[in-house]
Amino acid sequence: MGKLIAVLLVWWPFMASSDNWFPVTVQADGVTQPYQPLAKANKIWRICALLPHGKDHYWWGVAWGLSEEASRLGVMLGIYEAGGYDQPDKQRAQLQQCRQKKADAYIIAAIAADGLSPELQQLVQAGIPVIDLINGIDGDNVTSHSVVSFTDMSATALRYILQQSTKPIRLGWFPGPKGAAWVRDADLGVQSLIQNGNITLLNAGYGPPDAFHQAGLTRQFYQDHHAVDFVLANAVAAKAVAQFQLRNPVSQSPIVAYYANPAVIEMLQMQQLAAAVTDSPVLQARIAVDLAVRSLQREKVPKRVSPQIEVLTPANLADFDLSRLLPPDEQWIIRRELLDIPAQD
């Protein structure tokens, strides 16, 4: 962690101010255009944000982006994290807690794509905005999606790998937690490119994106497969594989992460990863807050807004605006209760 702090201290002065993150280029309902958020909300709306967990530093950046944009717009925001992808009941309970608090709108990074369908249907039918953030929610029970396709993310990562080799490759694949919409979509992206016959896919198995589970999958994978040409992995597994390779030089192979978090950025800087794809999660969080406020103010919003996918390498990392991906140095996960409606005299 000390090395990561040193890296961020070098880069942070060059990162964009949180008040100057816009305009940014996005795909809005399939059209490439600049995204310009509101200057301020027209009242102090109360918004509830639900995240799957705070174990992966990826979500630290998301929580920070949510909090910063809510502050900039002048709205109240509660931020809840369920504790893991094995905690769907807790996320459902947190949703009910926000309903009891009469939240005006919801921003949800769902544990499962269909895990909250009945509750979300009730909210949308009542005219309460629901914004799908990052993970993906199935069906029509959302007002808008602030997401990047993980099908495109994993496919972009795999295309990068294919550009590095003209020979058939054995690919180690560490997808992430089974049942999550983003992992399902990432699987689809990989499957879409292995039909050319040049890839032998070796699936390491599914598991929660925490260090304990991904390290276990890594050990088992290398017991079953002593050598591969490339590894394509979720961000937490990418670190687990890199650490395993440092201890076991015979297992060396280039690693590509199909999304990025602070640990991935550190490993890129140290040249322990070949590349990583980023979906700019802080931007997605900021956009989600803006979409929620616009919806509350009866503005027409796009059904889907997606920042551009970018491939980061040790060579181009210094040119990337890290404020799209990372919170400031020493910023941890933000958890915050949604304040109750003030009592009327």
Predicted regions mapped to residue ranges:
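An alpha-beta-alpha
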Residues: I47, L51, L66, A155-I199, ...
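Extracytoplasmic "Venus flytrap"
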Residues: T25-P37, W45-G65, E69, G78-R92, ...
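Hinge/cleft segment of the Venus flytrap/periplasmic-binding protein
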Residues: D19-K40, L283, I287-D345
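Flexible loop/hinge segments that line or gate small-molecule binding clefts
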Residues: A113-D152, Q163, N261-Q269, L273-A274
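Short beta-strand elements in bilobed, periplasmic/extracellular small-molecule ligand-binding domains
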Residues: S71-Q87, R170-W173, Q191-F212
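N-terminal signal peptide c-region/cleavage motif recognized by signal peptidases
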Residues: P13-M15
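Hydrophobic alpha-helical segments within soluble ligand-binding/sensing domains
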Residues: H145-L171, D185, H213-A215, A260-V264, ...
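Hydrophobic alpha-helical
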Residues: A105-V124, V190, G207-M267
